[in-house]
Curated annotation (Swiss-Prot):
It comes from Gallus gallus. Residues 1-54 bind DNA. GO terms for molecular function: DNA binding. One of its GO terms (cellular component) is nucleus. This is SRY-related protein CH31. Its main location: nucleus. The keyword Calcium does not apply.
Length: 54
């Protein structure tokens, strides 16, 4: 979406992607949720002492 609309602000891109995400079924969301869990576990293994500090 960002490549197709290079002048679009990130906030607008986020809104549109959020709206598209809400339209997906649970089955369509599942691969993304599973990948996020896998990456989270990998990150925790590689960086066990990591603490989010905004």
């Amino acid at each position: 979406m960002a490549q197709e609309n290079p002048k679009m602000h990130n906030s607008e891109i986020s809104k549109r992607l959020g709206a598209e995400w809400k339209l997906l079924s649970e089955a369509e969301k599942r691969p993304f949720i599973d990948e996020a869990k896998r990456l989270r576990a990998m990150h925790m293994k590689e960086y066990p002492n990591y603490k989010y500090r905004p």
